[in-house]
Each structure stands twice: as structure tokens, then as C-alpha cells.
């Protein structure tokens, strides 16, 4: 993939801004704690906020690393650890845990249905986790206050594909918008949150298609305000 130079610079500038802001917040919060400006009973709350900011920053940097790895001739192992077993409910729970605290601030929950069935595929759990983290991040950012993000997974009988469906009420997007495109953010989303890299969902598509040989899609129903993401991964089995 060869990107227009001006567009690349704009993307990197925006990305850098998204990384620096949380780190500045972390440094400011730590200074306030160390200087004794934060009451002792408020320190745990502030530390959880710091952890959330650091998790966001790490996720952004991982997205950039995946973007470089899967769109260039960057000399990296593109399919490392792909012989591992990805237990889908376990990876979903791990990914969701990063956004539970952030979601609570707006009354948004993440719930996995039917977690008892251990559907699985062969692949790298860390890479699949990043896909789910990006989608949960999107859901928490643009979800409606007090809504629930529901996650279901099952194995389709005729194809053997594992299907992961993530649904929740949220700010929508138009059908003509390719929200998985590089640097693309829905018009309605930009009205709610001005900042954003436009990289997370693009990385989801790169990983699902290029690493797992699967498919990812999304749709929004304006009448019900329901946004759904569907991930299809071949080679499903029950662990």
C-alpha cells in the first residue's frame, strides 16, 4: 500500500496528538498525587484514571505497529504464534476488561452471552484481542449513555466459521461510509468526538482479513440506533 505523502503526514500528526494528550494527562495526575494535592481517599480513583489513559495509549501504539506490519514490507513475523488455540470467550473477556471502567463512567456495560461454550480457532490470541479491543473502544466512545454492548459467539454449522457479533445502541454511520477505511470516521461520530485517529477499525479489517483469513462487517439501523459488528473466522471448533 502506498499512501499519499500529505495524507500520511496528516495521519501521523493526528496519531501523535492522540498519544501525547493521554501521556500529558498521566504526568499531570502523577505530579498532583506526588505533591499531595489529591486527597488520600481520592488517590485510588485517580490511579484508575491514570491506568485507563495508559491503556488507551498502549492500544494506539499497538494499532500503529499492526498498521505498519500489515501494510508494508516491514520485516516482521506476520503470522507468529498462529498455531496457538484462541478460546473465543476468553479473548472477548480479556479485551472487554480494558474498557469496563471507562464504560462505567457513562453507564455503558459489556456483556458476553453464552460464555460457557468454549468456541475456538487456531491463531494468535494477542492479535485477535486487539481487534476486539478496537471494537469495544469504539463502542464505549460512541455508545449511548446507559446502553449495553452485547457480545455473542457461535460456530456456524454449514461453514464451520466462528462468528462473533457485537451489538449496542450508539451514534450511527451512513451505509455509504466505509468505516473500515484508513483514516475514515463517520460524520456523526465526529460531531460527538472531534478527535480520533481513524486507524482502529482499519486495523481490525487488516488483521481479520490478512491474518485470520476472515471477514468483518458493520451495519447501523437508524430506527433502533443499533450498531452491529460481525467477525467471521474460519476453522472453528469447540475446545
Where are these regions (language model features)?
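Conserved micro-motifs of the catalytic ATP-binding
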Residues: 72-81, 120-123
